[in-house]
Design a protein with these regions (language model features):
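Alpha-helical transmembrane segments of multi-pass inner-membrane proteins
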Residues: 64-65, 96-97, 137-172, 179-245, ...
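Transmembrane signal-anchor hairpin modules in multi-pass inner-membrane enzymes, especially those
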Residues: 1-98, 128-141, 204, 381, ...
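Long extracytoplasmic/lumenal interhelical loops at the membrane interface
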Residues: 281-297, 305, 309-352, 371, ...
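Hydrophobic transmembrane alpha-helices and their immediate junctions
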Residues: 128, 206-209, 242, 351-396, ...
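Membrane-interface helix-loop-helix junctions at transmembrane boundaries of multi-pass membrane enzymes
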Residues: 17-23, 72-87, 201-212, 248-257, ...
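A membrane-periplasm/extracellular boundary helix in multi-pass inner-membrane enzymes
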Residues: 23, 152-159, 223-224, 241-287, ...
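Aromatic-anchored transmembrane helix interface
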Residues: 85-93, 106-128, 138-144, 148
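Transmembrane alpha-helices of multi-pass inner-membrane enzymes
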Residues: 388-437
């Protein structure tokens, strides 16, 4: 949000102008709606749906990048934009650039990284263009309701693509909702984050619109069939909101880090730590997270072969190296058909190396938690930081079972990025409630 009290106002652009305020809100809404819905909603199931290099996406997201860049240069306070730059995120993107350079197909990896950069630019635009909390709430509500209502409409108008069929490579997903999104594993987390947006709007006084978004998103999320998502959403809300209600907001960062460590031990720990592996075999011998443990064990072997720089961006999954790899008959998961490792943290390590993973953990966990602790004790800042922390907690936990980090313009990744960068903003500037003229 560009209109701040802590930073001096620029004398070049009259940021308080109500017309510019409305234009900024509209542009931020359009950008967020596009990254949520994309230029190609309701795509058929299968590998073709995952391809992002078609001409529609290239032209569409290229135009979106120009719109976002133009908006940042003409409508946003440049000092606020500069404030969004984080040293740790620069290190992360430096590792990304390095992994592009030693990819098996650098031009293809560069195109994928360019889409990732466009997504980052779009989220920064969504965060800094709105002049105040009221404008940002409007952006979330309009874009969120557009994505939710379009997905509901798809159930009626395009049932063959808005609902998973039993004819694809995943017949077990038949009947589960995915709406305008590429997969139920994308639709579920997006709806979860939109439910947090509805709750944020509700807390700020937008009762009807916020409550509507919250309920509609929760209902859709429940029909995506993801029990993990359905459980993590209320858990994230309670773990973030409850400490603040009892005046113990300082506990939220402790809870966050405890949850991350606990989730790491409960998922990766039972694969790579022998005592935990033995304990899991005794207590829950069938615990495989739907076969994911076999996939993670394979990833551990691959990471050990190239621990420093990994295999390169876009250079592991869905490559000939994987396609022609021998598949043991007793492995629970056929890795040749996987498009990712179902663990975002392991995927960073296998693509970019362990040093890159270490930098990502600092940027993803440590820096946002520090920012949350530094948030001013002002109503709008607290509401906003709680919203971002809910997103961050949910997506960080979800990443132990799914993979979306640094993944082009994946809306789950972009919501996660919004949580991280938004927390940075909430900690550093006073968020005005509404434009006061």
């Amino acid at each position: 949000m560009s209109n701040t009290d802590r930073l001096r106002r620029t004398e070049v652009v009259p940021l308080g102008n109500p017309t510019l305020r409305q234009i900024s809100t509209v542009l931020a809404t359009v950008v967020l709606a596009i990254v949520l819905i994309s230029f190609r909603p309701f795509q058929p199931e299968g590998p073709a749906a995952a391809q992002g290099g078609d001409i529609v996406n290239q032209i569409g997201f290229g135009s979106l990048a120009l719109l976002a860049l133009f908006s940042l240069l003409t409508l946003a306070d440049r000092r606020v934009v500069a404030m969004m730059v984080s040293p740790w995120w620069l290190i992360v993107f430096g590792f990304l650039a390095l992994s592009v350079m030693h990819a098996i197909d650098p031009p293809s990896a560069m195109r994928a990284a360019l889409f990732t950069a466009i997504g980052v630019l779009a989220i920064v635009t969504v965060l800094v263009l709105p002049r105040d909390a009221e404008s940002f709430t409007t952006v979330l509500l309009v874009a969120g309701l557009a994505a939710v209502l379009l997905s509901y409409a798809g159930l009626i108008l395009f049932p063959a693509t808005a609902v998973h069929s039993g004819a694809g490579v995943e017949p077990q997903h038949a009947g589960l909702w995915r709406g305008a999104f590429s997969h139920k594993n994308v639709a579920g987390p997006v709806m979860a984050c939109l439910s947090f947006a509805g709750l944020y709007a509700f807390r700020r006084g937008r009762r009807w619109a916020g409550g509507t978004l919250l309920v509609l998103a929760m209902i859709f999320m429940a029909n995506t069939g993801s029990k993990t998502t359905a459980g993590l959403v209320p858990l994230s809300i309670v773990l973030v909101a409850l400490p603040g209600i009892f005046g113990m907001r300082f506990l939220t960062p402790v809870i966050f880090m405890t949850m991350m460590i606990g989730a790491a031990l409960a998922t990766l720990g039972i694969v790579f730590i022998e005592p935990l592996k033995d304990l899991a075999q005794q207590v829950a011998p069938d615990l495989t997270y739907t076969g994911r443990t076999a996939l993670w064990d394979f990833l551990g072997e691959m990471i050990a072969k190239k621990p420093w720089f990994g295999y390169g961006y876009e250079s592991f999954w869905s490559t000939p190296f994987i396609y022609f790899m021998e598949q043991p008959f007793d492995r629970d998961w056929d890795i040749r058909g996987s498009v990712h490792g179902h663990n975002g943290y392991l995927d960073i390590a296998v693509l970019m190396g362990l040093p890159a993973l270490a930098a990502c953990l600092v940027a993803f966990w440590i820096v946002p938690v520090r920012d949350y602790m530094r948030t001013p004790r002002l109503k709008e800042n607290i509401y906003l930081s709680d919203f971002f922390m809910m997103i961050l907690m949910f997506t960080s936990l979800n990443a132990f079972l799914e993979s979306f980090f640094l993944r082009r313009v994946d809306p789950v990744w972009l919501f996660f990025l919004m949580g991280c960068l938004g927390m940075r903003m909430a900690a550093r500037i006073r968020i005005p409630s509404a434009w006061s003229g």
